[in-house]
Amino acid sequence: MFEATTILGYRGEFDNKKFALIGGDGQVTLGNCVVKANAIKIRSLYHNQVLSGFAGSTADAFSLFDMFERILESKKGDLFKSVVDFSKEWRKDKYLRRLEAMMIVLNFDHVFILSGTGDVLEAEDNKIAAIGSGGNFALSAARALDHFAHLEPRKLVEESLKIAGDLCIYTNTNIKILEL
């Protein structure tokens, strides 16, 4: 259940305009059975200034969302400070260290992966990040499309997630996308 989804975050500049998008599939899997095909695993936070998405246990992810949103509010939307404080708080709490979820959070300037161990990882290129069972498929597709095609950002996210959905049995092509 920990990896059974695909979430893709993408930020940058297109035609001299900054963008930030997050997309995810809608499949919820319990063991080897699909129990829902249209779940929403992405959210807009802090007055639509930060995007987030999760992979993993739904109950754990909602706990993480709530905690991260509280910290983000206290830091007045400063994403960098929020992820650092989030990681510190996560590592101090025995309960949180056992949560089986990962998150991507991003804005116009940063893309971070928050791991199940409390680690904060900035995307290698600070542009594209993916998590979940189809994450590597989506990440590879997004990097290739970003490098070789001049696609609108929304189309790039959609096509990358479709490729992941075609290859990963825990990911479907019922795609939801949010953008700043």
From Swiss-Prot:
Its main location: cytoplasm. GO terms for cellular component: HslUV protease complex; proteasome core complex. The active site is at T5. Na(+) binds at G165, C168, T171. Keywords: Allosteric enzyme, Cytoplasm, Hydrolase, Metal-binding, Protease, Sodium, Threonine protease. It catalyses: ATP-dependent cleavage of peptide bonds with broad specificity. This is ATP-dependent protease subunit HslV. It is found in: Cytoplasm. One of its GO terms (biological process) is proteolysis involved in protein catabolic process. It is an enzyme of class 3 (hydrolase). PANTHER family: ATP-DEPENDENT PROTEASE SUBUNIT HSLV, METALLOPROTEASE TLDD. Allosterically activated by HslU binding. Pfam families: Proteasome. It comes from Helicobacter pylori (strain J99 / ATCC 700824) (Campylobacter pylori J99). Its EC number is 3.4.25.2. Belongs to the peptidase T1B family. HslV subfamily. Protease subunit of a proteasome-like degradation complex believed to be a general protein degrading machinery. It comes from the Bacteria. A double ring-shaped homohexamer of HslV is capped on each side by a ring-shaped HslU homohexamer. The assembly of the HslU/HslV complex is dependent on binding of ATP. One of its GO terms (molecular function) is threonine-type endopeptidase activity.
